[in-house]
From Swiss-Prot:
It is found in: Secreted. Expressed by the venom gland. Residues 26-39 form a propeptide. Coiled coil: none annotated. GO terms for biological process: defense response to bacterium. Cationic amphipathic alpha-helical peptide with antimicrobial activities against E.coli (MIC=3.1 uM), S.aureus (MIC=25 uM), and S.cerevisiae (MIC=50 uM). Also shows histamine-releasing activity (37.5% at 10 uM). Does not show hemolytic activity, even at 50 uM. Truncated sequences of this peptide have also been found in the venom. It is possible they have been cleaved in the venom. The keyword Secreted applies. It comes from Odontomachus monticola. One of its GO terms (cellular component) is extracellular region. This is U-poneritoxin(01)-Om3a.
Amino acid sequence: MKPSGLALAFLVVFMMAIMYNSVQAAAIADADAEAEAIAKIKWGKIFKKGGKLIGKTALEAAANAAASEAISAMASQNEK
C-alpha cells in the first residue's frame, strides 16, 4: 500500500506544526523567566533605595537628637 501525496503533505505539515509549537513554548518559558528576573532586579533596586533613604533619615534624626541634647546641656550649664 503506497501513501498518497496528500497524506504525506498532511504528515509533513502536521510534524512542522508540532515542532513549531514546541519551540515556541520553550521561547515563551524563557521570556517568562527573563521577565521574572527583571522584575526581581527592579524590586531589589526599589528596596535598596528605600533602605538607603530610611537609613539616611535615621542618621539625620540621630544627629538632630544629639545636637539637641548638646544644646540643652550647654543651656543648662549657662543657667548655673
